[in-house]
Amino acid sequence: MVTYSKIIKKLSADVPFVGPEAQERLLGSVFKVRLGANESVFGPSEKAIIAMQNCISKDVWKYGDPENYDLRNEIAKRMNLGHYNVIIGEGIDGLLGYLIRLIIEPGTKVISSLGAYPTFNYHVRGSGGELIFVPYYKDHENLDSLIKAASKSGAKLIYFANPDNPMGTVHSAKKIEEIIKKIPDDCLLCIDEAYADFSPEEFIPNID
């Protein structure tokens, strides 16, 4: 008889993030705007639609390039980065999964806010990591307390979102640049900027 791993057996049988489609089926109505899924209310641009239509008969039936070479290089060029600074994934959930698998092993401590993005927690638990939560302060993720918790516990990873979902609050770029200097050398800071386009430019840190 096939049995699950010890880590999987410890996981609760819940869904970390209920998608909008499931919520629509449950409610019996369709959301007019799905900001919680970070979707544009304007839809794709006409240029994007034409480009997708043009490629249907050419390449869409093939396996995609596993290195995403052209896409990574185009993004790197537009963002003034090296292509090695760009990774392509299945949305934020896929990218978080890659990150966790790179860094977290059973028993590794991870710092996050109590009430932050649940799918991040799902990936950490699935890898056997130990989550340490820091409460929000005045509806904001408490950055100073996140750093203190990491220093005290010996955590290898800190996660927070800026702007934050679901609270909608945001920290200034200056504040984030200040706390980066306080992070332990053996700890990685993961900033989820999925909603960066909803905030003023001065709230997005210029991190080299």
For the regions a language model picked out, list residue spans one by one.
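Residue-level marker for buried hydrophobic side chains located in beta-strands
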Residues: L35, L189-C190
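Conserved core of the PLP fold type I
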Residues: V60-P184, C190, Y195-D208
